[in-house]
Amino acid sequence: MKLQNSFRDYTAESSLFVRRALVAFLGILLLTGVLIANLYNVQIVRFDDYQTRSNENRIKLVPIPPSRGIIYDRNGTPLALNRTIYQLEMMPEKVDNVQQTLDALRDVVDLTDDDIAGFKKERARSHRFTSIPVKVNLSEVQVARFAVNQYRFPGVEVKGYKRRYYPYNSALTHVIGYVSKINDKDVDRLDKEGKLANYASTHDIGKLGIERYYEDVLHGQTGYEEVEVNNRGRVIRQLKEVPPQAGRDIYLTLDLKLQQYIETLLAGSRAAVVVTDPRTGAILALVSTPSYDPNLFVDGISSKDYSALLNDPNTPLVNRATQGVYPPASTVKPYVAVSALSAGVITRNTSLFDPGWWQLPGSEKRYRDWKKWGHGHLNVTKALEESADTYFYQVAYDMGIDRLSEWMSKFGYGHYTGIDLSEERSGNMPTREWKLKRFKKPWYQGDTIPVGIGQGYWTATPIQMNKALMILINDGVVKVPHLLQSTVEDGKPVPWVQPHEPPVGDIHSGYWEIAKDGMYGVANRGNGTAHKYFASAPYKIAAKSGTAQVFGLKANETYNAHRISERLRDHKLMTAFAPYNNPQVAVAMILENGGAGPAVGTIMRQILDYIMLGDNNTTLPSENPAVTAGEDQ
């Protein structure tokens, strides 16, 4: 046994070794192949991908915000401009102790508790490794103090930014609007519109007025610089720069001095005035009072200040010129006259006797005239001059609500005017369908009668009243009211183009002249309701006044402003144009509850004198219109 086991099978062992070596070799070869294949995949196939990833760690794209376009008035006066402001920023990840740093900054830059609270709020919603504002709008002294102490505050620096500034404060807020910080709602909208990338480094966006409407024109195109950074995120060198394209400057049709002058006339009143050039539709002034300072919103208005504006009973946040809706009252009588003449309901000689009231046929219901004892025999011209309600009650009855609504819609009532502001209401031009939908009730004949004098369910904005007036002045040719005069491209002005709209009625009918002659009589003839304000002017004026009732009077009750609450007093309205034979200016005005100063006719004359004569020394009756209701019909 011992002898037999001492002999080994070298052949078998050799064969086993060879097999094992071959398997090991094949395993090594396979693993080497996998390694080579992976190396090929990384170095050749996915080279661009991994190079991009490497560059993303080493190369950063830093967006450069564009400079926002400047807004000028028609004479080249800047109304909204950019000025450099400095703000203190901190990157918390580069600061050892944020709270200690904030405490140390108190004495250096006059840091307040509100500043610190704002920083912490902003930090909570910011990404890592982003600079967060600590204090905005630093003074030169604060910037200098920090520069001396900057070595003590790693991770903290002062940066300069262009910030919007409105030098004329409240005078233009409802026209220019304002920019403010981009919020989540803005981000969602920009993302849906595919514009978010162009706001990568922009802090503000147009929120209201011209700033909002022409945001795409004013904003510009964001640039960027390609920089190489080290492992700490510090810039080593600049590799490439694509400069931003500044936003385009725009010129408005507004006249700043006229705007400011009208604002002084309306001081203390809730009121609106729209002044246009009827030849072009250009808006020379658009004033709504009271107003507010738009600069409050640029840096972010405080909750206290915003709450005060929001809860102000005089509603300064509302643009009364485009968003205020009121019964247009007797200012619509010239347009009703043109409509009735065009429809063949009346002629220039159609007469009516006015005893001071008009009775609905087949009914005991009487509609009173503002003049208790009546106007006597009337034709359309005299009815306009004396603003006789009874004549237009009859006209409305004969026209019917369907024709009346159709014609007034042609004058722009119940529709947006096309003004280049987003903040506009369409008012209401009532129809049978509207009442059925709104009140679930049919239209009655009695509903039509007050519509004939601009009352009832009819509401309109001052900008609509002005557009209708321009249509009358131009014999039915429609001019869209607009604020943009031109934009600037490559240093050259690009003028705004008036869109074509179909005319209203027959521009050669001669009916327009009848209505305008009635307005001329209002301002110049002895029986005209506003002749005492305008007859003495060295140029000729045509006008139409109106009184919009805030609440109804009982039968045989007399209006007395002294006995009712100020908020229940009648609104005073007026439209006017001048010079009569070659109109260059059209004005629409409303004084809510009669205003707080001179009569509506006095203010209108002062505005027209300022435009036509270049002075503001008009001396006219200045009684508060709340005292007298009848003569301003």
Predicted region positions:
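Periplasmic/cell-envelope proteins involved in peptidoglycan metabolism and beta-lactam response
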Residues: 1-303, 325, 347-348, 402-412, ...
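Beta-lactam-recognizing serine transpeptidase/beta-lactamase-like catalytic domain environment
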Residues: 2-11, 80, 229-239, 279-331, ...
